Structure formats: structure tokens, C-alpha cells
UniProtKB/Swiss-Prot annotation:
One of its GO terms (biological process) is proton motive force-driven plasma membrane ATP synthesis. HAMAP family: ATP_synth_E_arch (MF_00311). Keywords: ATP synthesis, Hydrogen ion transport, Ion transport, Transport. Gene3D superfamilies: ATP synthase, E subunit, C-terminal. This is V-type proton ATPase subunit E. It comes from Dictyoglomus thermophilum (strain ATCC 35947 / DSM 3960 / H-6-12). The lineage of its organism: Bacteria, Pseudomonadati, Dictyoglomota, Dictyoglomia, Dictyoglomales. The gene is atpE.
Amino acid sequence: MSLERIVERLETEKRTKIEEIKNKKEKEFQEFVAKKEKELEEWKEKQKRSLKEKLNREENTLAAQLKLKYNAEKLRIESDAIAKVKNLVLERLKSSSNEVYNKIWENLLERESIKSGEMILTKNEDKIDVDYFCKKYSLTLSKDRMEGNGGFVIQKDNLVIDLTVDTIIEELVNKNILEIAQILHGER
């Protein structure tokens, strides 16, 4: 074999080997790039899911906070409305005639079956016919006065019957709270 042919054959083998190595490295590079692109896409998806979950949690937290603020404000408004109702009842009671006013207390004393005891008036009470009630129900009038918007307390031994305007209005509201709530919510 001639030297030229050997060189030519070696050149051909060299080019073939170079081409094989080049193709192999190109394939490895393409596989590496594909693997890294896949990892990048998986990482992006994971970050998207994580961000979406975080946003959902923050949205839920914000919604819960807003609902809590709304309910607190609603409760404050309802409480104010109930306080206004109580004040209106108190004003109506105070502005009623002496006859009507005393009839209310007489009905309350009858309901409680009062037969004797000590009557303690509130500081603001000035419409009750004390002499009439003391005589009819065998009550003694205390020199002391107590806090309140009207009415009185009857004490006998260990028994205390609170017939103050504040207590009666509070009991009236509590007894009718469901109906009041329905009115406040526009259900009636």
C-alpha cells in the first residue's frame, strides 16, 4: 500500500471518528439541554403552584378579615339600634301619663305577687304614687335611692325583685330579641 493511500485512509478514519465524536457530543448536548429545559419547566410550574397557593391563602385571610370587620360593624350597628329602641321605650314610658305609668307598675307588682317588703326607688323616679303602692302592697319606703332610670326594687328577707326601668326594658328586649333581629335584618 502506498503511503498516500494510508494517509488517505487515516484521514477518512479521522474524519469519521471526528464526526462520530461530534455527533455523540451534539447528542449529549441536546439531551443535556432538553433535561435542563424540562427541569426549568418543572421548577416554573412548582413556583406557579406555590405562588397560586400563597395568593389563595392570602385571599382567604383577607376575605376572613373583611368578613370579621363587616360582622363587627353590623353588630355595632345592631347594638346601636337596640340601644335606640331601649331609649325610645324609656322615653315613651317616662312621657306616659301618671295614671298609665302607675298602672304599669301595679300590673308588674300583681304579676310578681308582692304582698310586703321594702321599696327602694331609683334616683330618677318621681312619677310613682308611692303612698298608694305602699298601702296596697304593705310596702315600706326606703330612705335610700339607687341608680337607674326609674322604677324600684322590692326587698324582702333574702328576696330581691328588680322592677327598675332598666331591668324591665332589658328583659323585654331579651325576650323579643329574635323578633328585633328579624326586623333589623329586614325579614319582617
